[in-house]
């Protein structure tokens, strides 16, 4: 964290620097005009994590500022959602005088939504007992007079939940509300407003699609649920079980009837498509019945591995969302041989940082 960089008056200039950097990084490729999707300048981040400092009777949140090489007391936090900022003082005021809840508490995590729900995780260097659970339940009831809140207590090999370990998000996407279950400690898009812009961009660039869609790394179904309207059928893969469970919930909640989720890694699915290996998880799934002209990938920071990269080249259109422009650059050196970039976007998920989220649509040459 760099506190000095978090200046809303400097946001537009910082975003312009990112735009220039991204455009320059891909200068050797033939790209269309870069579409830039800005963030809110404050209160854009739907989750936040704070360490907790004990100082006599005092107790407070802090973060470490690498630029200043010191810990910074956080009464409020400009990047965090307004809901998190509203919760921060209320929670700390309740924790500070409570010896059971504050003892050996070392971290507080918040997960909030645009729909008004918030999940608070309290992390401890001690085992949690019945007395802790009783006090935590009373804390939840007290906070519930102002917030739609759930509380989780975590310790080594221990997790106690009052009453849910998830929130339900509702995103307005092109005039339609999309519902998403977001589970604690599972990946969710951190910037709610930019997440909406990403979904709307993906819907727009696939609007006239034919055939089916294959998505790798689908998470909780964030994109596949939004894109299902543009395709006959959608087949999506995800390895993390909590994310797959959330995706199944989200399919039902949004009444999607043309989307199937398979719990597999992208690498294993690539082998399955190539008929290199058979997998029990694919029993009853007729891969040959799918007519996937478009593939959607949103890989981790390492980008696509060589086998997956070769596999995606077999599709007419590739929609690639990247959280690391350097690995996207490496992947495009291969993909550019068979496909051309027809849409190019920058999504500012993380203002006041060097992080750049980008998206490209590639179509066969």
From Swiss-Prot:
Gene Ontology terms: cellular component: cytosol
Enzyme class, UniProt record, top EC level: transferase
Annotated keywords: Methyltransferase, S-adenosyl-L-methionine, Transferase, tRNA processing
Active-site residues, as the UniProt record annotates them: 323, 357
GO biological process: tRNA methylation
Role played: Dual-specificity methyltransferase that catalyzes the formation of 5-methyluridine at position 54 (m5U54) in all tRNAs, and that of position 341 (m5U341) in tmRNA (transfer-mRNA).
Protein name per UniProt: tRNA/tmRNA (uracil-C(5))-methyltransferase
Lineage: Bacteria, Pseudomonadati, Pseudomonadota, Gammaproteobacteria, Alteromonadales
């Amino acid at each position: 964290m760099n506190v000095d960089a978090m200046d809303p008056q400097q946001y537009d200039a910082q975003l312009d620097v990112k735009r220039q950097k991204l455009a320059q990084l891909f200068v050797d490729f033939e790209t269309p005009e870069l579409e830039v999707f800005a963030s809110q300048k404050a209160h854009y981040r739907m989750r936040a994590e704070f360490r907790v400092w004990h100082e006599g009777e005092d107790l407070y949140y802090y973060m470490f500022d690498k630029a200043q090489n010191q810990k910074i007391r956080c009464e409020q936090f400009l990047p965090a959602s307004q809901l998190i900022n509203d919760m921060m003082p209320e929670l700390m005021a309740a924790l500070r005088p409570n010896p059971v809840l504050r003892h050996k508490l070392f971290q507080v995590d918040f997960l909030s939504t645009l729909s008004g729900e918030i999940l608070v995780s309290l992390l401890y260097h001690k085992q949690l007992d019945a007395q802790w659970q009783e006090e935590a339940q009373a804390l939840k009831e007290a906070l519930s007079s102002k917030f739609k809140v759930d509380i989780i207590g975590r310790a080594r090999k221990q997790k106690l939940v009052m009453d849910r370990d998830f929130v339900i998000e509702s995103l307005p996407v092109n005039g339609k509300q999309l519902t998403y279950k977001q589970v604690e400690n599972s990946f969710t898009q951190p910037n709610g407003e930019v997440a909406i812009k990403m979904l709307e961009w993906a819907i727009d660039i696939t609007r006239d699609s034919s055939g089916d869609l294959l998505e790798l790394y689908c998470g909780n179904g964030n994109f596949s649920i939004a894109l299902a309207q543009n395709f006959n059928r959608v087949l999506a893969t995800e390895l993390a079980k909590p994310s797959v469970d959330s995706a199944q919930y989200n399919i039902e909640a949004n009444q999607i009837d043309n989307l199937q989720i398979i719990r597999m890694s992208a690498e294993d699915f690539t082998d399955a498509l190539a008929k290199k290996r058979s997998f029990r998880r694919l029993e009853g799934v007729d891969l040959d019945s799918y007519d996937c002209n478009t593939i959607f990938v949103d890989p981790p920071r390492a980008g696509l591995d060589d086998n997956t990269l070769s596999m995606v080249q077999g599709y007419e259109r590739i929609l690639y969302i990247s959280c690391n422009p350097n690995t996207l650059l490496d992947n495009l050196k291969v993909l550019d041989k068979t496909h051309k970039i027809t849409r190019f976007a920058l999504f500012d998920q993380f203002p006041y940082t060097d992080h750049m989220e980008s998206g490209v649509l590639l179509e066969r040459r």
